[in-house]
Amino acid sequence: MTDPSVVHARAPAPDRIGRLGAGVRGLMQHAEEAAGLAQRPGLLQGLDPRAKVAGAFALILAAVATRSLLVLLALFVLATALAAASQISPARLARQVWIVVLGFTGMIALPALILVPGTPVLSLPFGLAITEQGLRAAAFLTGRSETTATLALALVLTTPWPQVLKALRCLGVPRAAVMILGMTHRYIFVLADLALDLFEARRSRLVGRLSPAEARRLATGIAGALFERALALSSEVHLAMLARGWRGEVHLIDDFRFRPRDGGALVLAAAILAGVVWAGSVWP
């Protein structure tokens, strides 16, 4: 395995190393901003984490279960309004959720426009046609993805991650699942910190440019060194946590307090879900 600390006669282009490091720093900055946002005054910030998790889950189920585009649009507007009332700007939602989800689900939903049989609304070459049913299927896929992603982001940005994990345990999620979520979240930032150290070490040794083939070999060496260090560190961290009595349960200094407004929010979310399910059974 190539040791990335070895000084080469030439080094990779500064812009390439800079872009990689900037991406890792952007991840760390996003985590800091999210932690700060969870402490701001806002509608969702003032609710009990258990009510937020259960309510978000109910609204996500409603978005998945609805058979009406108007109801789905109303749920999307509700999710956006909840985010805005919690100091999450539409620009942030567009940057972190809407554009990404639209691009990803759009590529998946695009074939449905012509593959779903139905009433043609637009003729295309080679005997193809965009159908009304295809447009409806694509709209449902995109709308459900946008709505559920907006609700999930609003939950995560307004609730510290340890509180989310504890709320999941309080709602009956298995300890193994919560443990996996907690360790995954923690090791993402462990890997990011290690990667940032490697990029900075390489950047300090820049003396020129590498050929594309040499740059790829160097990137492979950095990736291998990162994986090796992360594997060793993860084992050490896990053993240290076990030695300190960690068994997968989430313990916080402050206990949750369920207040009347938390109950009201939970009842409202449950009523929306029940209304969507009832409407779907009455008007299939």
Curated annotation (Swiss-Prot):
Membrane topology: Multi-pass membrane protein
Main location: membrane
Compartment(s) of residence: Cell inner membrane
Domain of life the protein comes from: Bacteria
Hydrolase recorded as keyword: no
GO terms for cellular component: ATP-binding cassette (ABC) transporter complex
InterPro entries: ABC/ECF_trnsptr_transmembrane, ECF_CbiQ, ECF_transporter_component
Residues passing through the membrane, by range: 57-77, 97-117, 176-196, 263-283
NCBIfam families xrefs: ECF_T_CbiQ
Family designation: Belongs to the CbiQ family.
Quaternary organization: Forms an energy-coupling factor (ECF) transporter complex composed of an ATP-binding protein (A component, NikO), a transmembrane protein (T component, NikQ) and a fused possible substrate-capture protein (S component, NikMN) of unknown stoichimetry.
Function per UniProt: Part of the energy-coupling factor (ECF) transporter complex NikMNQO involved in nickel import. The complex confers nickel uptake upon expression in E.coli; can also transport cobalt with a very low affinity.
UniProt name for this protein: Nickel transport protein NikQ
Source taxonomy: Bacteria, Pseudomonadati, Pseudomonadota, Alphaproteobacteria, Rhodobacterales
Gene designation per UniProt: nikQ
